[in-house]
A protein has these predicted regions:
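Iron-sulfur (Fe-S) cluster-binding segments and ferredoxin-like electron-carrier domains
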Residues: 116-132
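Gly-rich Lys/Arg/Thr-decorated short loops/hinges at beta-loop-alpha junctions or inter-strand turns
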Residues: 92-93, 113-121, 212-218
Length: 253
């Protein structure tokens, strides 16, 4: 088996290029695995011996051959600005849940919510420029014909150029009735100005994520959201014409 640790856009291409060369040379499968084990982010289980503690937790992982990295490291995309992004998607014939253009604004998160694995393992935070996002979204809208653009990241409202980006998207696509959606917003930095802007096209749903029903539990999971934040955000939403909002909660904390 081949396991990729971390973000895959760069390392996957490196593996495929190595595979093409291996196919030309027609060496053994073991030779191929040995060759790609030196690629940062690649972990080959067969090239390591794993020792467990008595309680079945991992005690140590050591290479069983020479010239194998002693410890595989996860791969991080340092330059998200120029990393390949899907620009020609397969559009299904049937209605699907995420039938929209999905625009990744940045990677990582600085919030540190204790329940969020992604917020911990995808650090550091790396933003894409507005110009790069304009280029991506223009190609995606033309190639798919979708009538909605979803601004997606671990915490979309933390994107430093969100106001500038939404200004562009509304100005550029409102005439074609292409709407903008902001999924899973934080209550403590919800901007009614941006919400008002995107509803000029159509009033998409609003989703907030308080995660827990009491302040004590929100503090325990380090959510950083107060009861007042929830009341203020929902009050503003209703005053602006929304008649419902979606709230995400975790059950069983």
């Amino acid at each position: 088996d081949i396991v990729v640790l971390g973000e895959g856009e760069e390392v996957n291409l490196e593996i495929l290029n190595a595979y093409k060369e291996w196919k030309k040379n027609k060496t053994t499968r073991e030779d191929f695995l040995y060759q790609i084990s030196s690629i940062e982010g690649v972990y080959i289980p067969s090239l390591y011996d794993v020792t467990d503690n008595e309680e079945k937790t991992v005690k140590e992982v050591v290479p069983n051959r020479e010239n194998i990295p002693s410890k595989p490291h996860k791969r991080i995309i340092k330059d998200v600005e120029n990393v390949p992004y899907p620009e020609k998607l397969i559009v299904p014939f049937i209605d699907t849940v995420h039938n929209r253009v999905v625009l990744e604004l940045f990677r990582g998160c600085t919030r540190g919510c204790r329940f969020c694995q992604a917020g911990m393992i995808y650090r550091p935070i790396r933003e894409k420029s507005v110009e790069r996002l304009k280029e991506i979204v223009d190609k995606l809208v033309k190639s798919t014909g979708y009538d909605e653009i979803s601004l997606s990241s671990l915490s979309t409202s933390d994107y430093s150029k969100l106001s500038e980006l939404t200004d562009y998207l509304v100005d550029e696509y409102a005439s074609n009735n292409i709407g903008i959606s902001l999924p899973s917003l934080r209550l403590d930095n919800f901007s009614m100005e941006i919400a008002e802007k995107i509803q000029q096209v159509r009033k998409s749903g609003l989703t907030f994520a308080p995660e827990a029903g009491t302040q004590r539990l929100r503090d325990v999971i380090n959510k950083g959201v107060s009861e007042e934040d929830l009341q203020n955000a929902t009050k503003k939403a209703f005053e602006m014409g929304w008649n419902s909002v979606k709230l995400y909660f975790m059950i069983g904390l």
